[in-house]
Structures are given as C-alpha cells and as structure tokens.
Swiss-Prot record:
Protein name from the UniProt record: Phosphoribosylaminoimidazole-succinocarboxamide synthase
Enzyme class name: ligase
InterPro entries reported in the protein's UniProt record: SAICAR_synt/ADE2_N, SAICAR_synth, SAICAR_synthetase_CS
Keyword flag Cell membrane: no
Disulfide bonds: none
GO-annotated cellular components: cytoplasm
Pathway the protein takes part in: Purine metabolism; IMP biosynthesis via de novo pathway; 5-amino-1-(5-phospho-D-ribosyl)imidazole-4-carboxamide from 5-amino-1-(5-phospho-D-ribosyl)imidazole-4-carboxylate: step 1/2
Reactions catalysed, as given in the entry: 5-amino-1-(5-phospho-D-ribosyl)imidazole-4-carboxylate + L-aspartate + ATP = (2S)-2-[5-amino-1-(5-phospho-beta-D-ribosyl)imidazole-4-carboxamido]succinate + ADP + phosphate + 2 H(+)
SUPFAM superfamilies: SAICAR synthase-like
Length: 294
C-alpha cells in the first residue's frame, strides 16, 4: 500500500516542482504538469509533462553516473500512487545558491548580454556572433537564484566566488562544463544539438558536491534538431516553443509588457507541446515513453 501525498509535509514549491518531507534524510521531489513562460506560471497544464521531466532526469542521471541526489527507484514504495512517474525520492542536501549554466551556443539571455557588452557573464567572446552561433568553446555562465516570479540574474564567475568561495566555485564550473560536454556529445550522436543547460548542485552532510534537481530536461536545456541548424535565426526547439510563440503572437491577445497574467492555452497548443516533450525524451533516450512508470 503506497502512502498518500497528504501523509508528507509540503516543504516548498517552485514554478514546476514541489518538495515534500519523507524523513530527516529524504525528500519527495514532485514534478507537476505546470508550465511557465516569461516568468509566469500558466493556468493551463501540459498533460504528462511532469512524467517526461522525471523520466528524462532519471535517464541522464544514469548516463552521467557520479554523485547525484537519487535515493530510490522511480517506482519506490515511498512514492504515492497519485504522483507515481513524476516523483522521485531524493537525498536532503544543502543546495548551492547558484544556477550553473553551460552554453555552447549563443541565444536567449546570453545573446542579449553579448549584444550589450560583447561578453556573457563577464566571459569575453569574439565579435560578429549572431543568434544561435556556436561558441569557440562552451562557457560557464552562472545565474543567481531568483524568488518565484522574479528573473534569474546572470552573474560573473567572480560573483560565484564571493557567494561560495574559490574552491567550490571552481568545482561548480568544472563539473558543469564536464556534464555539458558529455551530454552535448551524447545528444549529437542522436542528431540533436544541446545549445545550453542549467544544472543545480547541493552539498551532502560530508561536504561532497552532489548533482541535484532536474538534469538535462527540455525545461532546463535548449535542445535543437541538428538537421536544418543555421546560425543567424531562431532554431526550432524541443521545449515550450509552441507556448512562447502563441503567447507573443496576435492570437493570444496578451501583452507581455503588461501586468496581466497570460491567458489559458488553446487545446492544440497544449497537445503540440505535450508531443514535443515526449519526442525529446524518445529521440534522446531511445526509449518509449509508453514504458515509463505511472
């Protein structure tokens, strides 16, 4: 008999995930079907999104090996039935207050930063780069963790040193770039470009650095089809692209600059987004989503 979710105390909630306390050493990390865009959590969920994020994280924790926060299998008996397939039993960690971002291509906030300063997070880059340009080498572009509803703010490596100290800052940078490099090669073998990814780490009671939260999902990473890649234009991606395009297009009637929340998503955008998430999982993992637990 599996426990009820009500039997665990709710510890914290973010845009997409919720944390519950299992015991002194373990947490239940639950991925919801909520979707966020432009710093808003939308009122319309995407069916199966939480399961895809969980399946993708479990897959890549396995590929990467090393020290991660998993403390049970995806069907662990401590996971309640109502969240089976989108929840994981994880170790309780002291989370590092830095979003660890690796970029191999220039897009998003990195492109904005580059266009203003010629650098990203203080890392100088060559002149003449454009949307989706491949960088000479992947770079570490950390961000400070923002409160719910606020923007993560890109920060320099020196700012990370001030936050956590030199030794830990160097390890965060090195581990982030190592993981990005291995995952990028893995995706490339499957015809997919990993443009960038965001990782989070925590410290265990012994002070060891542990890979935590989600890893290499369509929410934390930009995946582009390698077929048709061309620098200088926005690439199609395996994530919330349909949602973003609809919200900023005339059909939604929503003004991004206003204080009003985004409108509900139409059914066709919901289904297209669901299919895109599942396609990302299946193409990258080589597994069938139909076989995932839950």
């Amino acid at each position: 008999m599996r426990p009820s979710l009500d039997s665990y105390a709710h510890l914290a909630g973010g845009k997409v995930r919720d944390l519950y306390t299992i015991d002194d050493e373990h947490l239940l990390l639950v991925a919801s079907d909520r979707i966020s865009a432009y710093d808003h959590v939308l009122s319309t969920p995407i069916p199966d999104k939480g399961r895809v994020l969980t399946a993708m994280s479990v897959f890549f924790f396995g590929v990467l090996g090393g020290n991660n926060h998993l403390a049970g299998e995806p069907d662990d008996s401590r996971i309640p039935e109502e969240v089976l397939g989108r929840a994981l039993v994880v170790r309780k960690l002291d989370m590092v207050p830095v979003e660890c971002v690796a970029r191999g291509y220039l897009t998003g906030s990195g492109l904005l930063d580059y266009n203003e300063t010629g650098a990203v997070c203080g890392v100088a880059l060559p002149e003449g780069l454009v949307e989706a340009s491949q960088l000479p080498d992947p770079i570490f572009t950390p961000a400070s963790k923002a409160e719910l509803g606020e923007h993560d703010e890109n920060i320099s490596f020196e700012a990370v040193v001030e936050k956590v100290g030199q030794d830990l800052a160097v390890k965060l940078r090195d581990d982030t770039l190592d993981i990005y490099g291995r995952a990028s090669n893995f995706a490339a073998d499957r015809g997919i470009i990993l443009a960038d990814t965001k990782l989070e780490f925590g410290l265990d009671p012994q002070g060891n650095l542990v890979l935590a939260d989600e890893v290499l999902t369509p929410d934390s990473s930009r995946y582009w089809p390698a077929d048709g890649y061309e620098a200088g234009k926005v690439q199609p991606s395996f994530d919330k692209q349909f949602v973003r395009n609809w919200l900023t297009g005339p059909e939604s009637g929503w003004d991004r600059a206003s204080d009003t929340p985004p409108p509900p998503l139409p059914a066709e955008i919901v289904e297209a987004t669901r299919e895109r998430y599942i396609e990302a999982y299946e193409r990258i993992s080589g597994l069938s989503f139909a076989d995932w637990v839950g």
